[in-house]
UniProtKB/Swiss-Prot annotation:
Start and end residues of each 4Fe-4S ferredoxin-type domain: 55-84, 95-124
Reaction it catalyzes: a plastoquinone + NADH + (n+1) H(+)(in) = a plastoquinol + NAD(+) + n H(+)(out); a plastoquinone + NADPH + (n+1) H(+)(in) = a plastoquinol + NADP(+) + n H(+)(out)
Annotated residues for binding of [4Fe-4S] cluster 2: C74, C104, C107, C110
Entries under InterPro entries matching the protein: 4Fe4S_Fe-S-bd, 4Fe4S_Fe_S_CS, NADH_quinone_OxRdtase_chainI, NDHI
The protein's role, per its UniProt record: NDH shuttles electrons from NAD(P)H:plastoquinone, via FMN and iron-sulfur (Fe-S) centers, to quinones in the photosynthetic chain and possibly in a chloroplast respiratory chain. The immediate electron acceptor for the enzyme in this species is believed to be plastoquinone. Couples the redox reaction to proton translocation, and thus conserves the redox energy in a proton gradient.
Subunit structure: NDH is composed of at least 16 different subunits, 5 of which are encoded in the nucleus.
Localization, UniProt: Plastid, Chloroplast thylakoid membrane
Name of the molecule in the record: NAD(P)H-quinone oxidoreductase subunit I, chloroplastic
CC per GO annotation: chloroplast thylakoid membrane
Main localization (coarse): plastid
């Protein structure tokens, strides 16, 4: 008889605890209803990347000494380095350097361990194509400097309009058009 009474007490405690958890979750949900949506309309407004963002790799052909450190530290042996040994000067001459960004995991090991700093990570993240073979960049494509996000005209609207400058009338409901089209 006593186990039955303690069972009912445990059931009652569990019911109260479940109701409290449901109430807490509703309070959290309702606290988010007063916030304005933070949405970036991607093709027209671009995301500002952080300083440590790991985007497309930039390659400087003149600095490379064909040491192949980038290939050895890459977890997937991705960079393809073609070189020829110049016997009269006893140095390697770089012929071709390429990286396939369809396979690259953007870990940044090649950039970190390069002894001549000929590799660097850029803030470019728009690498999507319809054909995966277009993601295989040679030394010419890797040497192309990316367009800075700060100088891009589509970024200016985000940088110059903090949340405090947005003016909307209180009778209009808040939606994505109200915030982005000021």
């Amino acid at each position: 008889m006593f186990p039955m009474i303690t069972g009912f007490m445990n059931y009652g405690q569990q019911t109260v605890r479940a109701a409290r958890y449901i109430g807490q979750s509703f309070m959290i949900t309702l606290s988010h209803t007063n916030r304005l949506p933070v949405t970036i309309q991607y093709p027209y407004e671009k995301l500002l990347t952080s300083e440590r963002f790991r985007g497309r790799i930039h390659f400087e052909f003149d600095k490379c000494i064909a040491c192949e450190v980038c290939v050895r530290v890459c977890p997937i042996d991705l960079p393809v380095v073609d070189w020829k040994l110049e016997t009269y000067i006893r140095k390697k001459r770089l012929l071709n350097y390429s990286i396939d960004f369809g396979i690259c995991i953007f870990c940044g090991n090649c950039v970190e361990y390069c002894p001549t700093n000929c590799l660097s990570m850029t803030e470019e993240y728009e690498l999507s194509t319809y054909d995966r073979h277009e993601l295989n960049y040679n030394q010419i494509a890797l040497g192309r400097l990316p367009m800075s996000a700060i100088g891009d005209y589509t970024i200016r609207t985000i940088m110059n309009s903090p949340q405090t400058k947005i003016k909307t009338s209180m009778d209009k409901p808040f939606d994505s058009r109200t915030i982005t089209n000021h």
